Regions:
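Bacterial N-terminal signal peptides that target proteins for export
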Residues: 1-13
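N-terminal signal peptide c-region/cleavage motif recognized by signal peptidases
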Residues: 21-24
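Short, glycine-/small- and polar/acidic-enriched structural segments
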Residues: 30-160, 165-168, 184-190
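Ligand-binding "clamshell"
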Residues: 94-106, 195-209, 267, 288
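Periplasmic-binding protein-like
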Residues: 109-120, 202-227, 238-241, 278-281, ...
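Pocket-lining segment of extracytoplasmic ligand-binding domains
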Residues: 172-264
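Secondary-structure end/capping motifs
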Residues: 229-312
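Conserved C-terminal helix/tail region of periplasmic/extracytoplasmic solute-binding proteins
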Residues: 300-335
């Protein structure tokens, strides 16, 4: 079993290592590689399946699935991945704080109700007696949005996490262990979260989390160097994503669902249900003060400072203004 502090040290050291190698970025001019999540349906997967990205940007697009945003950071550091679609903010902050030169260029999705922690049903623990979680065993994907949400919820309920046995587990593995009765509380997102809920209950709803300042959204992230060398390609990529969001918001949603479901590895019913809990900001909304116009930068700083306070990372940046670049999205808006 891995303690929280051991996991934190492992994540921090790993990210410091990848920060030292990110300068080895290599890009094949005829192909780019994009990281994404399975069981995480989004409208742009219609374009992924139909190769609309390839047609728009003029190069082959290879899609590689990941289990967590921390792995996306490592892949971008090594140069194996140029774009990560729907990377969680906490793993981005951990990598950026360690010195990796990444940037947020687009808000992929907002989803307060599709990332959460679930308590084992027979414990009969809810928000009225959450303090009883002390001493219990938890499965949490360290360094991710779910980890951030877990720590914020435990802080809210006054739960001393030092008394808990916390295992670093990706959502799919956590859901399986939870189903077998090996964990008391488990955290995750997407399809794994749905499976977790079959055996337990959440402590807070998405709306309740938002009131505590727990924002849950993902971003499209890139290697800064690669983006600067390929601005037109990146702008075209973001334009296709925005077009797919607009297409899904129109009357085309029904016809898109089967294609999205197949790409995401989920059935049509669960794909539709998941998408109903997602919000996809338009380009105009993303360029506003709420998002890339300042709100996102402030949230990055809040996450960084909180992780320092919790001992997850040794230090945060003075600010994360350089970690956000809206110029590519502004260019996409003109296409």
């Amino acid at each position: 079993m891995t303690s929280l502090n051991t996991s934190i040290r492992t994540v921090s050291l790993s990210l410091i290592f990848i920060a030292c190698i990110f300068h080895t970025q290599q890009t094949n001019a005829d192909q780019i590689t994009v990281g994404y999540f399975l069981e995480w349906p989004t409208p742009n997967q219609f374009a992924q399946s139909k190769k609309l990205y390839d047609k728009a940007i003029g190069v082959d697009v290879k899609w590689v699935s990941f289990d967590a945003g921390t792995a996306m950071s490592a892949a971008m550091a090594s140069g194996d991945v140029q774009i990560s679609f729907s990377q969680g903010i906490p793993p981005f902050v951990v990598a950026a704080s360690a010195g990796q030169d990444l940037q947020i260029v687009d808000i992929a999705v907002s989803y307060s109700d599709n990332e959460n922690c679930v308590v084992r049903e027979n414990l009969e623990i809810d928000k009225t007696n959450a303090k009883e979680l002390e001493g219990k065993q938890a499965g949490v994907p360290i360094g991710t949005a779910a980890h951030y949400g877990f720590l914020k919820q435990m802080q809210h309920f006054g739960v001393n996490t030092n008394t808990m046995k916390i295992v670093d587990m990706e959502p799919a593995a956590g859901a399986a262990a939870f189903a077998n009765g090996n964990l008391d509380i488990v955290c995750g997102w997407g399809g794994a979260l749905s499976r977790m809920k079959e055996h337990g209950n959440i402590l807070l709803t998405g709306t309740e989390k938002e009131k505590l300042g727990i924002q849950v959204f993902d971003a499209t992230t890139v290697s800064t160097q690669w983006a600067q060398e390929n601005p037109e390609l990146l702008a075209k990529f973001l334009k296709v994503t925005a077009d797919m969001n607009a297409k899904y918001a129109s009357s085309d949603a029904t016809s898109m669902l089967p294609i999205i479901a197949e790409a995401a590895g989920t059935d049509i019913a669960s794909t539709k249900a998941t998408l109903q809990t997602f919000t996809f900001p338009t380009i105009k909304q993303q360029l506003s003060e709420q998002w890339l116009g300042g709100g996102t930068q402030r949230f990055l700083k809040n996450v960084g400072d909180f992780f320092v306070e919790q001992g997850t990372i040794p230090k945060a940046r003075k600010d994360y203004n350089s970690s956000v670049d809206s110029s590519y999205l502004e260019a996409a808006a003109k296409l």
